Amino acid sequence: MTNPITHYIGSFIDEFALSGVTDAVVCPGSRSTPLAVLAAAHPDIQVHIQIDERSAGFFALGLAKARQRPVMLICTSGTAAANFYPAVIEAHYSRVPLIVLTADRPHELREVGAPQAINQHFLFGNFVKFFTDSALPEENPQMLSYIRTLAGRAVSEAGKRPMGPVHINVPLREPLMPDLSAAPFERMRKGRHVSVTTGIQSADQDSLCHITERLAGTERGMIVCGEIHGEAEKQQIIALAEMLQFPILADPLSNLRNGKHDKTLIIDAYDSFLKDEAIKEALRPDAVIRFGPMPVSKPLFLWLRDDPAIEQFIVDEDGGWRDPTQAGAHMIHCHPSVFLEAVRSAETGKRPSGWLEKWQFVNERFRSHLQAASMDDLSFEGNVYRQLQHLVPEGSSIFVGNSMPIRDVDTFFEKQDRSFRVYANRGANGIDGVVSSAMGLCEGTKAPVTLVIGDLSFYHDLNGLLAAKKLGIPLTVILINNDGGGIFSFLPQASDKTHFEELFGTPTGLDFRHAAALYGGTYTCPETWEAFKDAYQPQADKPGLHIIELKTDRTSRVQFHRDLLQAAVREVKKEWKL
């Protein structure tokens, strides 16, 4: 007699494949044997083995970012599942679709002291969109139909907007090994068992017309763009800006700063000049239209938060509530194309001259001043991003670590015509799991990835480097090593000289060349920008791990950074007579 696990779990895995899932990230373990073996045996599913569960969770996250569809994440019972938690949280807040399948002991072995058995019910709390504890395997037609329906529902829940993680806890009795000779994927197969149809999110036309009529009469407006995924959405936003003659304040994750599209209306230096009160007042808008999550820039956030006279319109197709300013806003839950068409219908075509030109003037002057800063100083981290955007291979991706790297990208990354994409984990903004996320992204895009990361974040996720060795992933790591938490040097904590280094600076003194040796990668530590280019360009699109370490100084960079921006402010205000 065939073990019921074979056709029950086989049908489960098969329905995921029929529903469009192509990838499963699997962590080794005994209780998850049927899930792992049958996923590996399925002809339409690619299995990615990750030994460490925390790393695996973030690898799946990066893979799902690349695929823009759900990815399965499989582990055994016990604390293995708990190690997925940070990645599940990030997936929740960044709206990335994951299907977490945790194997479990059968009901009779729960809460009785059985080994490797913990309470896995609602393990991820409110950070998953859907949770269920599946029934124990049975082979009768009703149960095979049930488990297929459950798989289809999981894919639907993870993929519908707002996308996010779902969790199915799968109790399994021994024997755990399925019979691969028993045609495990064919029972109850009748095409796709569950089909879900979705469409473009629209909005009440009367309400939308009222909002767009208000915008049509606005002369001083701007568009703010956070992270954006689709090319069509980018083009719609550019078309809207051209129609309204509003500047676009483009976060680096919007990918509006790079690519072949027209960038005449793109403002890329706003993080620098919005720190000055006089410049802010001169550029103060009456209305702001925002797409995507709140951008990285703190000066922009504070401006929108603290000026109640700025009317805010937040367009969010997913129907979420992404407004940390809490300054009051019009929440518009519709697809950007619907919003664009409504504005087009209400637009009068009259716009005063001078408003857009003001933004362009300030932006160009600030960008010119930042470009004129010394390019020879290897200790100035801002130069990394100015160099990198001209060196990164066309069609590749840059994954940016949190803390200082993403902020420096925001400040120093210029608009230009080369085609690549910029990614980061900005859901919960943690420094953990960044290496593994970049690895998953690289595997998903099948194109080179350059990871820019600080030393503490790199240390957090050294385990993630194993994927580069095992899979031959073309990952180049630009390691910004200031021996500690560089961001704290910009914060008030730095004034406490007694406790700062111990509690916040946290130097490690690690020699990272050994990490390259451990994981079979190359390592260089250039001392000039020419040496940096010579180290980066030949390796950037080659398979395997390549670490380029840039040693910088936390203390001196703070003053250099401040002096640079203050000098730019003085020059622009003098020229503008502010």
UniProtKB/Swiss-Prot annotation:
Co-factor note (free text): Binds 1 thiamine pyrophosphate per subunit.
InterPro entries, sorted: DHS-like_NAD/FAD-binding_dom, MenaQ_synth_MenD, MenD_middle, THDP-binding, Thiamin_PyroP_enz_TPP-bd_dom, TPP_enzyme_TPP-bd
Keyword Chloroplast: no
Transmembrane portions of the chain: none
Entries under CDD domains matching the protein: TPP_PYR_MenD, TPP_SHCHC_synthase
GO BP term, example: menaquinone biosynthetic process
The keyword Manganese belongs to this UniProt entry's keyword annotation: yes
EC number: 2.2.1.9
Cofactor: Mg(2+); Mn(2+); thiamine diphosphate
Pfam families membership: TPP_enzyme_C, TPP_enzyme_M_2, TPP_enzyme_N
Catalytic activity of the protein: isochorismate + 2-oxoglutarate + H(+) = 5-enolpyruvoyl-6-hydroxy-2-succinyl-cyclohex-3-ene-1-carboxylate + CO2
Enzyme class: transferase
Keywords: Magnesium, Manganese, Menaquinone biosynthesis, Metal-binding, Thiamine pyrophosphate, Transferase
Disulfide bonds: none
Pathway annotation: Quinol/quinone metabolism; 1,4-dihydroxy-2-naphthoate biosynthesis; 1,4-dihydroxy-2-naphthoate from chorismate: step 2/7; Quinol/quinone metabolism; menaquinone biosynthesis
GO molecular function, a single term: magnesium ion binding
General function of this protein: Catalyzes the thiamine diphosphate-dependent decarboxylation of 2-oxoglutarate and the subsequent addition of the resulting succinic semialdehyde-thiamine pyrophosphate anion to isochorismate to yield 2-succinyl-5-enolpyruvyl-6-hydroxy-3-cyclohexene-1-carboxylate (SEPHCHC).
HAMAP family hit by this protein: MenD
SUBUNIT field: Homodimer.
Family: Belongs to the TPP enzyme family. MenD subfamily.
Annotated protein name in UniProt: 2-succinyl-5-enolpyruvyl-6-hydroxy-3-cyclohexene-1-carboxylate synthase
Species this protein is from: Bacillus velezensis (strain DSM 23117 / BGSC 10A6 / LMG 26770 / FZB42) (Bacillus amyloliquefaciens subsp. plantarum)
Species lineage: Bacteria, Bacillati, Bacillota, Bacilli, Bacillales
